[in-house]
C-alpha cells in the first residue's frame, strides 16, 4: 500500500483551499492549509509535508517569495505552483527556482492527479 501523502495547500482563497482539500482527501492525502506565503513557510517547518501546492499571488508574502524561503530550508520538497494570472515568464521563474510543476487555475481533477503522481515520485 502506498504511503499516505501529507500535502500543504497554500492559497488566499478559502473556496479554492476547500475545493483542493476535497480533491486531495478524495485521493487519499492528509491535507494541511495555509492562507499566505508566510503561513506556508511556518507550516512547512512545523508539519513537514511531503509536498506543497502554492499559489503565486497572495497578500503579505506571495508564492514566489515563499518558494525562495522554502527552498533555502527544505530544498528537496516538491512544490506545485498554482496561478490564475500566470504568465510564461512567471512559469519559467518558478521552475528555475525549483518548483516541480505549474498548474493554471481553474485546474482539472486530471491535473491534480498528475501533480500528485509527480510528488509521489519525489518522496
Where would I find each of the regions flagged by the language model?
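A Lys-centered signature of the CheY-like receiver
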Residues: 105
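Acidic catalytic/metal-coordinating carboxylates
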Residues: 36-39, 62-65
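Conserved sequence signature across two-component system core domains
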Residues: 10-11, 34, 52
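Alpha4 helix (beta4-alpha4-beta5 surface) of REC/receiver domains from two-component response regulators
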Residues: 65, 86-101, 113
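Receiver (REC) domain active-site loop signature in two-component systems and cognate sites
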Residues: 58
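Active-site beta3 strand of CheY-like receiver
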Residues: 47-53
Amino acid at each position: 500500500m502506498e504511503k499516505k501523502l501529507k500535502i500543504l495547500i497554500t492559497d488566499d482563497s478559502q473556496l479554492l483551499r476547500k475545493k483542493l482539500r476535497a480533491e486531495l482527501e478524495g485521493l487519499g492525502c492528509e491535507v494541511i492549509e495555509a492562507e499566505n506565503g508566510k503561513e506556508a513557510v511556518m507550516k512547512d517547518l512545523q508539519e513537514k509535508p511531503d509536498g506543497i501546492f502554492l499559489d503565486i499571488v497572495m497578500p503579505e508574502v506571495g508564492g514566489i517569495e515563499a518558494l525562495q524561503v522554502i527552498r533555502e530550508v527544505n530544498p528537496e520538497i516538491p512544490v506545485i505552483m498554482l496561478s490564475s494570472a500566470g504568465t510564461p515568464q512567471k512559469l519559467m521563474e518558478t521552475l528555475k527556482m525549483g518548483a516541480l510543476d505549474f498548474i493554471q487555475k481553474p485546474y482539472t481533477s486530471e491535473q491534480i492527479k498528475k501533480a500528485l503522481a509527480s510528488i509521489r515520485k519525489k518522496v
